[in-house]
């Protein structure tokens, strides 16, 4: 058996179905071997960032390990931005790259570099196979480490000569690994006592809580607690319409503290807590608030905050145990107070809905199209089982307040914050859920980072609807320029240099056509609904270039 065969059969043994890649010469052994392993499907991308982004979203939404194969040092360099996002999203990925013949190492070969060192800062483990006899163990370990909590990408370098070496090694079986720890009973009791003594509890959920969505909802209702998501997230854990759900937190300490004003006990579940953009001193939690942190890996427990109680546990196990302990210890007075808190949250939810509908009505006929109108039309047009891949950035608050996501997997965000994720990400989501409609929402600036994804959609016949929110600018940068000038005392009202995407305008319909995808320009509000209906009914990749309002 050759090294390339051990590589391929290791993937199959671990349930891998897709290899996402952009081929190169050093990957020739793998590409050639694919002819002998038809159960592995190669998803071709025209840029390594697209391949890695698609694989990351596939891994996040399928529950399976994503595998990427890219080309030597320049290819890995092209993929590093998406690799950063995958690390932040904790995507279980095995990223591989072909490497030049090891016998050329000292001669400085074309395209050669230290791939292990390049990948190391953005991976859980980075290694190169030096002999074919190492293949079985390295692949077994790579596929395990990628899925060990906290999940994340690993890197394996594949020299072309080692892929062709003979070996007696055979792929190792993954086995059944039971890795979901139960919370310590003493910790559960301590956390329950804090919650039962709270006058205004709140729950903040990270992406790891998605597997415990029902438990989050049940505990929130038991406590009468508001539930917040992190500002940048992959998943929306609770349904949009759940009365306790308060959407996403902002990105600086002062604003987070304001959102959580009055909270005396915060239960933080399955996330790093908190990711900020702007510095401010002090804790994100209100003065005097106590924190309980549930985390599946010790390394992230109490990492950024001092907590009163920390539990290393699978979120589902911890929340189930907490709910039982709270239910057992709740007094009649606590239950009455929790019911009042739930009533108040329900009323606040209704007020928020009315406010958003009024916001949309006020700007319903605006041209360029208002963002609230666009989101309202999307909500009306979406099939009930649709998945939205969101990189709408400044349009995100209107999306969150308007579109009703009923299940945790209905919304997939752009964790990490590096732009260009939605277009390739939607490809991975569609491969993970081929029977569900998938709609990608992307700003115009973000789309241009990974526009080659349209070709992959056409090439593999992936019926994704790509909606480009085209405001002809980097709107988020204009908002952040205002914030910068205010925070650092710079002169205001000096304009926004190099933040407009004009002269020439970006022609997304023309670009899409050149990449094999039909497109339609939407510039008037009345055109939105028929355009969305056409795109969603096309049964093939389709792009809508929607002219929306700019900075407001």
Feature locations, PLM:
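Thiamine diphosphate
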Residues: 96, 106-111, 222, 257-260, ...
């Amino acid at each position: 058996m050759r090294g390339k065969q051990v590589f391929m059969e290791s993937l199959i043994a671990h349930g891998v179905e897709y290899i996402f890649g952009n081929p190169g010469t050093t990957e020739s052994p793998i590409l050639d071997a694919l002819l002998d392993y038809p159960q592995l499907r190669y998803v071709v991308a025209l840029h390594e960032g697209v391949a890695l982004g698609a694989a990351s979203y596939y891994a996040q939404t399928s529950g399976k390990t994503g595998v990427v194969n890219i080309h030597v040092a320049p290819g890995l360099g092209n993929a590093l931005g998406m690799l950063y996002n995958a690390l932040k999203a904790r995507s279980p990925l095995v990223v591989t790259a072909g490497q030049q013949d090891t016998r050329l190492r000292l001669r400085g070969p074309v395209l050669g570099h230290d791939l292990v060192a390049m990948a190391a800062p953005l991976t859980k483990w980075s290694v190169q196979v030096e002999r074919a006899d190492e293949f079985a163990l390295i692949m077994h370990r790579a596929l395990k480490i990628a899925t060990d909590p906290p999940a994340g990408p690993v890197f394996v370098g594949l020299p072309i000569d080692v892929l062709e070496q003979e070996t007696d090694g055979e792929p190792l079986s993954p086995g059944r690994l039971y890795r979901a720890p139960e919370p310590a009973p003493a910790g559960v009791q301590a956390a329950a006592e804090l919650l039962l003594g709270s006058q205004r509890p709140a729950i903040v959920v990270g992406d790891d809580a998605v597997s415990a969505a029902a438990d989050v909802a049940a505990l929130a209702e038991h406590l009468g607690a508001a539930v917040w998501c992190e500002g940048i997230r992959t998943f929306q854990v609770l349904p949009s319409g759940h009365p306790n759900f308060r959407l996403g937190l902002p990105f600086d300490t002062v604003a987070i503290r304001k959102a959580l004003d009055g909270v005396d006990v915060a239960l933080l579940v399955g996330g790093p807590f908190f990711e900020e953009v702007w510095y401010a001193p002090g804790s994100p939690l209100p003065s005097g608030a106590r924190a309980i942190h549930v985390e599946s890996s010790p390394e992230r427990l109490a990492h950024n905050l001092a907590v009163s109680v920390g539990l290393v546990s699978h979120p589902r196990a911890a929340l189930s145990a907490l709910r039982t302990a709270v239910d057992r210890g709740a007094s009649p007075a606590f239950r009455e107070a929790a019911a009042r808190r739930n009533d108040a949250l329900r009323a606040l939810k209704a007020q928020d809905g009315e406010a958003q509908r009024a916001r949309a009505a006020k700007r319903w006929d605006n041209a360029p199209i208002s963002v609230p109108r666009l989101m309202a039309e999307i909500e009306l047009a979406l099939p009930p089982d649709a998945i939205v891949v969101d990189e709408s950035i400044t349009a995100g608050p209107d999306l969150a307040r308007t579109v009703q996501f009923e299940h945790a997997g209905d919304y997939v965000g752009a964790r990490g914050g590096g732009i260009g994720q939605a277009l390739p990400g939607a490809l991975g989501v569609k491969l993970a859920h081929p029977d569900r409609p998938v709609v990608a929402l992307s700003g115009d600036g973000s789309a241009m980072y990974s526009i080659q994804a349209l070709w992959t959609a056409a090439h593999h016949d992936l019926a994704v609807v790509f909606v480009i929110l085209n405001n002809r600018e980097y709107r988020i940068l204009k908002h952040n320029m205002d914030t910068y000038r205010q925070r650092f005392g710079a002169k205001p009202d000096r304009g926004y240099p190099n933040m407009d995407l004009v002269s020439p305008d970006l022609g997304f319909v023309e670009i899409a056509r050149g990449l094999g995808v039909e497109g339609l320009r939407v510039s008037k509000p009345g055109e939105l609904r028929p355009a969305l209906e056409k795109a969603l009914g096309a049964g093939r990749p389709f792009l809508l270039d929607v002219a929306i309002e700019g900075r407001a």
